[in-house]
């Protein structure tokens, strides 16, 4: 029997239920460099003190349970327990608090996003003492970051592989997302790539359905890629969605894509799961494939301000799990995304060191210690009139993806691609000449449209299209 066990045994085991805050609320605790730190938005039930609510979160997401148990005496709770080390009220919200929790690193399996989330956001989100709970941010210590491989390539290596520099990359999601035959699908891919796009994309729910089986789609898309490359002299790609019902089937599809010689595959990382995503990312790393990530199902998890997981946490988890691109919202399109919040998690995806900045929703300083970065993908309800704003907001290290904004062109798919490429080149040139895209954007597009009939036609079609709705997830004032 260890000295520690002997000491506890001599005190005697006291059965019963006690307040969580007696053990798990430790405002005097000084966080360690090796701790995983979490910021939770906590809404306690009426009558539950915020300190008790924060302590309950720390307990239920680490070593605690609802009653004292005899086996507590067989381990060191001080070493392994989570600690709520700070509580602060949320400005402008009644009975809502930010609870800061520190977790010892030994609680987590190395290189496993799955295990990290199972602990931190597992059972605790159904805890009755809380009306609502949201994980706002995580600080991943460098010691834990180093157990992950992360993205296969990183931004600079991807640019080198594609030989594309000095501008955002251009993409298009093939529409309609469901119902096309494989041959017609491949035709649309070819027309878009030939027109000037860098990538085309399977939509998130294109897997292997009766109207288009995955192998047929892969073959016709590969033909489109190689034909468009030969005609344009540019490297092209199509995000072949390898997401499947089993990990084995997913890997079979990724292997076939590699055998075809295409540059990139795709995965729906939330519906597919982090275990599957990490496995696919490791395969892509070993076999020279880029990995595009779609965030299908994210809004179920992150859209409500008081409950769920903020997308900045899901973005950090993806960078750890592995992926070269991930959809990040557009700010200006049809999908949710406030500007400052979006730019906050875009920096968390791309940069190596990000300072704490509550004005952008970043609760902790994050050091990625050279873990490769991820390209944010702006996609959803965007068209040529949005090009100046997108170029200004996201900068060069991004993918701007126009689905309907390419395929909805009145003259067809290839002219739609031409219009987007011309608009992008015009915005990049104007920016490089010192013009302000935020204030002169529309003028820049009109000037370019004078010598591009394809762009002029696109401008006419979408001149009145706007998506002006207030974002659900906003910064605390």
UniProtKB/Swiss-Prot annotation:
The keyword Phosphoprotein does not apply. The modification N-acetylproline is found at residue 3. Its EC number is 4.1.1.39. It comes from the Eukaryota. GO terms for biological process: photorespiration; reductive pentose-phosphate cycle. The disulfide bond which can form in the large chain dimeric partners within the hexadecamer appears to be associated with oxidative stress and protein turnover. Keywords: Acetylation, Calvin cycle, Carbon dioxide fixation, Chloroplast, Disulfide bond, Lyase, Magnesium, Metal-binding, Methylation, Monooxygenase, Oxidoreductase, Photorespiration, Photosynthesis, Plastid. The record marks 334 as: Transition state stabilizer. The modification N6,N6,N6-trimethyllysine is found at residue 14. Mg(2+) binds at residues 201, 203-204. Residues 1-2 form a propeptide. It holds the Pfam family RuBisCO_large. One of its GO terms (cellular component) is chloroplast. InterPro entries: RuBisCO, RuBisCo_large_chain_AS, RuBisCO_lsu_C, RuBisCO_lsu_C_sf, RuBisCO_lsu_fd_N, RuBisCO_lsu_N_sf, RuBisCO_lsuI. The basic functional RuBisCO is composed of a large chain homodimer in a 'head-to-tail' conformation. In form I RuBisCO this homodimer is arranged in a barrel-like tetramer with the small subunits forming a tetrameric 'cap' on each end of the 'barrel'. Heterohexadecamer of 8 large chains and 8 small chains; disulfide-linked. The disulfide link is formed within the large subunit homodimers. This is Ribulose bisphosphate carboxylase large chain. It comes from Cichorium intybus.
